[in-house]
Amino acid sequence: MATITPVFKDGKRDNVTCYSPISKLSCVSKIFEHVIYKKLFFLTKSWISPNQHGFFSGRSTITNLTVFSEYCLSALEHGSQVEEVYTDFSKAFDKLSHTILFSKLQQFGFHSNFLKWIKSYLSNRVCKVVVEEFESRPYVQTSGVPQGSVLGPLFFNLFINDISLCFKNSKFLLYADDLKIYLRTDRVIAGLF
């Protein structure tokens, strides 16, 4: 059973949506996840978009910003500007559909026994929420990946990876569930300076 502790992000403390659910998992579970993670990451690292900078060794918020900054500087040097849109998928880790994840993993060609294990690992997860000395009744988590788990971020990256198919005429960068879509435009910007 996972114990979920709500961790405050920002906003009003009396608003439940301003908290992230962090799962406290058993040490045995985490050790097992580390073993699976090493193998799974080795098999999938070449599949994950180079535009995803979250939860990927050698990539970070810094590499994400560096790629974007270099693109912007190049545009400015050529007399252009860059239009961008920033998005953040609300509750992306909590709402991740297990059915869609299993389908995507199947498309990657994973062995059926491994897929059964992943399905077993994510399905019927019993959780309870603990806040100070108060604790909820146990409930079954029907979607999402456990935040605080070792495999959760990799599952999320594999889940969101095909978003790259949506951007044929623009650039994009991801940092986990934060998406930046951008494009160089050739508008005259001399009047701005």
Give the location of each predicted region.
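Short, conserved phosphate/pyrophosphate- and ester-handling motifs at nucleotide-, phospho-/glycolipid
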Residues: 148, 152
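Conserved pre-catalytic core of RNA-dependent polymerases
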Residues: 1-146, 183-184
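Active-site flanking residues adjacent to catalytic metal/cofactor-binding acidic residues
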Residues: 87, 176-177
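Conserved helix-loop-beta segment at the catalytic/binding core of cyclic-nucleotide signaling proteins
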Residues: 167-173
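Hydrophobic "anchor" residues on beta-strands that sit immediately upstream
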Residues: 84, 173-174
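Short, intrinsically disordered, charge-balanced linker/junction segments flanking boundaries
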Residues: 187-193
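Substrate-binding beta-hairpin/strand module that engages nucleic acids
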Residues: 173, 180-181
